[in-house]
């Protein structure tokens, strides 16, 4: 199974959507469909993606291009807020079948190396720390 959360419709070619829709074990949520949802609505949608894949071992890929104004290979003025992404990571870390985190597309520049490094360290610690009790 494969789940895609926050896929940007405007940057995804139609042939990719055609392929995704032809495979029954792929589920996706478009970013554009999530924009007007509340924080709780976004978390519920993310949780439904987790429920789709969490019955067997899985990994989480965090594409930094999906984070608003994050220095990345395809930086965008539209995306998830950093703290929302941290919430997604914390929720995922509670899944016993989540075996790895892959962070990709971060592209620190000379203007932002410290901020990118801090964000990446937040992502890692959010993913590996024990839940608050």
Model-derived segments and spans:
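Catalytic cores of soluble, metal-dependent hydrolases
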Residues: 3-5, 15, 19, 23-133
